[in-house]
Design a protein with these regions (language model features):
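N-terminal glycine-/serine-/threonine-rich beta1-alpha1-beta2 phosphate-ribose binding loop
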Residues: 1-94
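Rossmann-fold NAD(P)-binding glycine/threonine-rich loop
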Residues: 85-91, 104-141
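Conserved anion/nucleotide-ligand pocket segment
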Residues: 143-208
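Substrate-binding/catalytic subdomain of NAD(P)-dependent oxidoreductase enzymes
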Residues: 179-275, 280-282
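ATP-dependent carboxylate/acyl-activation modules
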Residues: 273-328, 335-341
């Protein structure tokens, strides 16, 4: 049986998950691919901690010892970070090695360049795990949705924020209370900034947009707002109005343009995304012929993410064994849409905290707040109305949520 040797860069949560799947599912993988997948070497900071515990793998802290090994044909990068990972992946591709990575930050910043290097060296760069964790999202976009013109993508792509918002909604707790519990139980990092401010979701949105439209948008060019200002009052009012609040990463086509943003939305309870609870993720893709499809599952964690990584490795091995040439798993070489910073007309829900909510039109929480609605309005018009609300005596704060209907 043909053997494909793997160099594993990183042996943490995801890296160890890759090892365990390849070990436990060895016979099944060999039957499906016709290839024996063997981790030859693994990059770790302290090799001596692993040498006596795991046999059959050479652990090293010298990345060149792995990248210069001509017998290794596939590099799996699960290091995290950008600069060091970029240098490793770039060198691997230039050396004629296939690469599988779960590194969304790396791909958001350097994905176009790395994809070009992969093309020039006739190797594969696969990264299914970078956006949906265990959810197969990117390959369907490339292989199955490509015959459609994508009209919109809305995604719950961060498990931490979805866990927090679900807990706030179902338990009636504040953001601060739920965040503390999430950190204590390992659902949120000690420094949750990347998650709760929407940065993690923005990196994933960049990758989705690149694959769906061929449009490369920088991180700084995307409007982003996290969940730190969402209150239990907002969630109560949303529920009374037939909605829930979700942090969505979205890209919407409008003619020849696409508009991207990451922010909390009021999502209709009749929409499939409203049913996505706790750490689960889901991505809604709407195509002109296909209509709307929903891809749903575990968005993070050792086994879901490692499963996607192994699936990419198996795909490469199968293609190599059968000498098959498939649709490249890469961005379009030419953009089909142009990025715009002007938001399209949208529906909005506006929460007004005031001691006199009855004086406003909308759904009221007595003596606390009111949720009022605007349909198909521009951001500029909405800002004028919000400014007017803020001048009214008794109004404390005003919060804005775009609306996603079913």
């Amino acid at each position: 049986m043909k053997v494909e040797k793997i160099g594993l860069l990183g042996f943490g949560t995801v890296g160890s998950g890759v090892y365990h799947i390849l070990t436990k599912k060895q016979m099944s993988i060999e039957k499906k691919t016709g290839v024996s997948l063997q981790i030859e070497k693994a990059l770790v900071k302290e090799p001596e901690l692993f040498a006596d515990k795991i046999s059959g793998i050479t652990f090293t802290s010298d990345v060149d010892y792995i990248l210069n090994d001509e017998e290794i044909s596939i590099i799996v990068e699960v290091l995290g970070g950008v600069d060091f990972a970029y240098n490793c992946v770039k060198k691997a591709l230039e050396s004629g090695k296939h690469v599988v990575t779960a590194n969304k930050d790396l791909l958001a910043k350097h994905g176009v360049e790395l994809s070009q290097i992969a093309r020039e060296n006739n190797v594969y760069l696969y990264y299914e795990a970078s956006v949906g964790g265990g959810i197969p999202v990117l390959r369907p976009l490339v292989e199955h949705v490509s015959s459609n013109e994508v009209e919109a993508i809305y995604g719950i792509v961060n498990g931490t924020t979805n866990f927090i918002l679900t807990s706030m909604s179902q338990q009636g707790l504040s953001y601060e209370e739920v965040l503390k519990t999430a950190q204590e139980n390992g659902f949120a990092e000690a420094d949750p900034t990347s998650d709760v401010e929407g940065y993690d979701a923005t990196y994933k949105l960049i990758i989705l947009t690149r694959l769906a439209f061929g449009t490369n948008v920088s991180f700084d060019a995307i409007p982003k707002k996290g969940i730190t200002e969402v209150t239990k009052t907002d969630l109560q009012l949303a529920k009374l109005s037939g909605y829930t609040i979700k942090l969505l990463a979205s890209v919407v086509a409008n003619g020849e343009e696409v508009y991207l943003e990451v922010r909390p939305y009021c999502v209709s309870l009749n929409h499939l995304l409203a049913q996505v609870a706790y750490e689960n993720n889901a991505i809604s893709v709407t195509g002109d012929a296909l209509g709307e499809i929903l891809l749903y599952g575990k968005g993070a964690g050792s086994h879901p993410t490692a499963t996607s990584v192994v699936a990419d490795v198996m795909m490469i091995a199968t293609q190599q064994n059968r000498n098959a040439k498939v649709v490249p798993f890469e961005p379009l070489t030419e953009a089909t849409k142009v990025h715009t910073t002007t938001a399209p007309l949208k529906d909005y829900a506006v929460v007004i905290e005031t001691s006199k909510p009855e004086e406003f039109d909308g759904v009221v929480l007595p003596n606390q707040a009111v949720l009022t609605r605007f349909t198909q309005i521009s951001e500029a018009e909405l800002e004028e109305k919000v400014f007017a609300y803020q001048q009214v005596d008794g109004v404390e704060t005003v919060r804005i949520y775009p609306v996603l209907e079913a």
